[in-house]
């Protein structure tokens, strides 16, 4: 079995060694320009067109949960990868727990009004504030995939009303499900905390705009853990300045690194992190890849295959 590996920033030596231990008998090599030797599998992140073009691969693994970058390249260069070759994304591989940590900590931060207390502290003001009603602090999750399910599961322990919105209806215990464009308004109008975990597709680019934000409850919060292109940043700022939104926590942006001139940096009710909500955990990723390749070699069913039409 021949496996090619390419990632512009990962520790290639570590990955080659770990994969060799996890898949005994496989010949695993780093792909470099000019390498036209046969391969069965390709493990990639932002691969050059020439790496995959014309190859008769059994499968390609994107080394992350998001596949928008490789799908964009495939759209521009359809000759890069034959449509019959399955493309897989990393399923969870430690990202679920990271998303749970991030989402739960931020929802509790807002629920306990730590943002307000920080503002009072900056004014040297000692002032206890009324508590929020837990039953009125509805958390809505946009995007009901693997990570959305993990976040909903973690939030259940805290007793908040939970709802989700996605293309198709879900049957998650304790979570009210909304599906399709016709139910988006109903999903939004009682949501106090909106968590975005949507995939990056043509349909979801710019979806968080003034039209959507104005349907939320007054004084709502936005937590964006998906992609920066989902959010119209001008509309977000307008919603914050009008106090339609009370706050926003952003891990992703339409341009990264965020330009220094962006008003988001200085806005008093915007908090941010540099796209670190959930990163690839190498050991978990190697385990997932090795197990999936083993199942594929045996002709067994697997999960994690990307629908190239839907984009996730």
UniProtKB/Swiss-Prot annotation:
Q: Key word Transmembrane helix present in the record?
A: no
E.C. designation(s): 1.1.1.79, 1.1.1.81
Per the record, its GO cellular-component terms are: cytoplasm
- SUPFAM superfamilies with a match to the protein in the record: NAD(P)-binding Rossmann-fold domains
The residues responsible for catalysis, as annotated, are 227, 275 (proton donor)
What this protein catalyses is: glycolate + NADP(+) = glyoxylate + NADPH + H(+); (R)-glycerate + NAD(+) = 3-hydroxypyruvate + NADH + H(+); (R)-glycerate + NADP(+) = 3-hydroxypyruvate + NADPH + H(+)
**Superkingdom in the source lineage:** Bacteria
What CDD domains does the database record attribute to this sequence?
GDH_like_2
Class of the enzyme per the UniProt entry, highest EC level: oxidoreductase
Q: Which InterPro entries does the record match to this protein?
A: D-isomer_DH_CS, D-isomer_DH_NAD-bd, GhrA_Enterobacterales, NAD(P)-bd_dom_sf
Q: Please classify the protein's predominant subcellular localization into one broad category.
A: cytoplasm
Protein's cellular compartments:
Cytoplasm
Disulfide bonds, paired cysteine numbers? none
Q: Which GO terms describe its molecular function?
A: glyoxylate reductase (NADPH) activity; hydroxypyruvate reductase (NADH) activity; hydroxypyruvate reductase (NADPH) activity; NAD binding
Q: Which PROSITE patterns match?
A: D_2_HYDROXYACID_DH_3
PANTHER family in alphabetical order: 2-HACID_DH_C DOMAIN-CONTAINING PROTEIN, D-ISOMER SPECIFIC 2-HYDROXYACID DEHYDROGENASE NAD-BINDING DOMAIN-CONTAINING PROTEIN
Described purpose of this protein according to its UniProt entry = Catalyzes the NADPH-dependent reduction of glyoxylate and hydroxypyruvate into glycolate and glycerate, respectively.
UniProt lists the family membership as follows: Belongs to the D-isomer specific 2-hydroxyacid dehydrogenase family. GhrA subfamily.
Its name, as the record gives it, is Glyoxylate/hydroxypyruvate reductase A
| Phylogenetic classification of the source organism | Bacteria, Pseudomonadati, Pseudomonadota, Gammaproteobacteria, Enterobacterales
């Amino acid at each position: 079995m021949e496996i090619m590996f390419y990632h512009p920033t990962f520790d290639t030596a570590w990955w080659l060694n770990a994969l060799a231990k996890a898949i005994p008998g496989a010949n695993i090599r780093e792909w470099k320009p000019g390498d036209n030797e046969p391969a069965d599998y390709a493990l990639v992140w932002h691969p050059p067109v020439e790496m995959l073009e014309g190859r008769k691969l059994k499968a390609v693994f994107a080394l992350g949960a998001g596949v928008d970058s490789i799908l964009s390249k495939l759209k521009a260069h359809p000759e890069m990868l034959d449509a019959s070759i399955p493309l897989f994304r990393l399923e969870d591989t430690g990202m679920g727990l990271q998303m749970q940590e991030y989402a739960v900590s931020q929802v509790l931060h807002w629920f306990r009004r730590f943002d307000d207390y920080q503002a009072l502290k900056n004014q040297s003001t000692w002032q206890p504030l009324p508590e929020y009603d837990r039953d009125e602090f509805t958390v809505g999750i946009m995007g009901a995939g693997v990570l959305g399910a993990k976040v909903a599961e973690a939030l259940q322990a805290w007793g908040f009303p939970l709802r989700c919105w996605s293309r198709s209806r879900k049957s998650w215990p304790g979570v009210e499900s909304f599906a399709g464009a016709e139910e988006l308004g109903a999903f939004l109008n009682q949501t106090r905390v909106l968590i975005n975990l949507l995939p990056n597709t043509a349909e979801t680019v710019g979806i968080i705009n003034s039209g959507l934000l104005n349907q939320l409850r007054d004084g709502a919060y936005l937590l964006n853990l998906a992609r920066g292109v989902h959010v119209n940043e001008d509309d977000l700022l307008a919603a914050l300045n009008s106090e339609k939104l009370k706050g926003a926590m952003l891990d992703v942006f339409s341009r990264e690194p965020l330009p220094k001139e962006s008003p988001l940096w200085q806005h008093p009710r915007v908090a941010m992190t540099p796209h670190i909500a959930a990163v690839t955990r190498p050991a978990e990723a190697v385990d997932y890849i090795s197990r999936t390749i083993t199942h594929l070699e045996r002709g067994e069913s697997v999960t994690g295959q990307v629908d190239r039409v839907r984009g996730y």
